[in-house]
Amino acid sequence: MNMSLRVKNIFHYLILILIVFLCSYIWKFIELPYSNGKGSIGALSKIKYNHLNDTVRYLFFIGLPLIYYLFFIYKTQETKLVNIKYFFKTFEIREDNFSFKSVWPIFIFLIFLLLIEFLSLKAPSISYLDPLHDGDYLTPAINYFHNKEFWESSFTVHGGSNIFYPLIAWKLFGTQTIGAFKVFKLILILILKILSIIFIFYISKFSNLEKKYKIILFTLLSLIILSFSSYYLIDYLSIRDLYALIFFIFFIQSFFKEDRTFLNLFISGITIFTIILHIDIGIYLYVILLSYKIYLLFSKKFKDFIQIIFFLFFSVIIVFLIFGSSEISSFFAQIKHIIFNIDKIHGLKYPQPFFSMGIEPDGSRATKVIIFQLISGIILISTLFFKSNYFKLNEKLFFLFFYIYCFIAFKNALGRSDGFHIMESSDWQSLIIYFSIIHLIIYLFRKNNFINLNIKLSYLISIVLISAVILPNIKFKNIINFKNRFEKSIYAPDIGYMSDKRINIINYLKEETVNEKCIQNFTEDLVIPYLIKKPNCTKYFSSWLASGFNIEKDYIEQLKNKKVKYILYSSPMFLVDDIKTADRLKYVNEFILDNYINVIQKDGYTLLKLKD
């Protein structure tokens, strides 16, 4: 690179940095007019803040710098870049120098240590019960037990996983307890970790690195992605990401296999079933599949395009046959409400990048994550457009679709902009950055021949690294009594999760409603119906989600039609964003106050009874 070009590049990078800060400054001035025609109430509606503001700001903040970066590399290094026709060429499949045979000792060692680590885990605490998030799962399950209905009995926030996970747990362990569900969630995290390693194996196939270097790449990336998930802490990867991992494990193989029939079947089926299980992840995956179909069409890969269309249709038919048209109709009504209203009901403002650091609680994290998103976009553009021998076309295209997923999945952070959701939305772009850094370091080591590496030394380095990272997490003394500890947790009576005051209230509610088949929960203490072992009378067990004119009408109709006798009107346990359900559902609240009277008011709990 000559001096003139180097100076130009430095100049353009400085402009790029300036654009990023300019976009950050302009962030707060991008504001759409507020309107709330559907009457949904949440933290954003209280301050008359348009829920789409942060999405538009995000598109501007990421889009403008990336457009400028693309412009300046074409301006300064056009001869080193590919043209558009390049992306529609026939795939050049790289000779596979990294089969499972190459890595099986490392893979088996990783899985072995993960299993040992799992056996050494502390059993779930028999004391803490999250009234909202645990209730999201336990109450839909109890609704199903009594009504034998899925979405017709439960309006869930995430999808079918809210219903199915406890049911599977109780079937697996043969007991209907909170502990069984909590242990099952730990098993799901273990599966998540194993799937993460499998995904990294396929990612490590990419590039022109020799096998001995790919072994190191696989090891380092595996350790990094394993650190993304935790059994007990809120972390980057969670059980919701199981479906994305399964999808990408099959999707990535579509880019280096000639016959893709079975892969097309799997990615189509996984997408549809993920929508059923976890709405937002399923929609993001469908956008990826839709983008892929468009690419197949333009690149004249008609066989794959037709297969995916057919398999999607086939998967939808299977879903209808499993659940029936009535259940699916209820489910799609829920999807519609969630898509158009969840940000209004549950949304929080995204902190202004840079300017919120040190001022807002999550300002620093929000800035870091959105900058990571931008950096991963710059890495993608460089990977896609430069005539590099490191990656083949098919490998570049996978990174493109993977980044699209990262880009749209960031919507979770833009919708609910608290620390937890921001962190959850930073996992995949972080992986792109780590892959690029490690790949670059390994390439420089190889180029400068710093280490005389061979296969045996690669294995040795990998074993040492894995041992150094994972072994300190293993509490070997816990392995001996693993069975007793976990059985104690699985079969622990639910009463152990309640304080004495809570037990008294639950007993009051049980006594008062002893002759009723159900209770209607109007609070955000969602676990109450499960604790009294009665289903919710309407499908709106999570009442705070049913905010908006049309859905409140349906709520009132269900109260009338089912002649609901008892309503738990208030609880001191939890309020989402400190907004009472009565303030969110004004029409339902008005109906309740007109038609119900107070029968119990104790320790912050209020139970209402239908007037005679």
List the predicted regions and their residue ranges.
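Short hydrophobic/aromatic helix or loop-helix immediately within or flanking a transmembrane segment
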Residues: D136-I142, E152-G179, V183
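Membrane-interface micro-motifs in multi-pass membrane enzymes
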Residues: K46-P65, G159, Y213-Q253, L277
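Hydrophobic/aromatic-rich transmembrane helices and adjacent perimembrane loops
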Residues: T55-F60, Y243-I246, I283-Y284, I408, ...
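Membrane-interface alpha helices of multi-pass inner-membrane proteins
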Residues: N264-I279, L285-L290, I318, Y405-N412
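Short periplasmic/luminal acceptor-recognition loop of GT-C membrane glycosyltransferases, typified by
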Residues: T156-V157, P493-A546, Y555-D577, Y605-L608
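Hydrophobic, aromatic-rich transmembrane alpha-helices
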Residues: L195-K205, F247, K368-N394, C406, ...
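Signature aromatic-anchored transmembrane alpha helix within multi-pass, membrane-resident enzymes
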Residues: K212-K214, I309-I317, I441-N478
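Membrane-interfacial, low-structure loops and terminal tails that flank and connect transmembrane helices
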Residues: M1-K8, K75-W104, F391, F445-N454
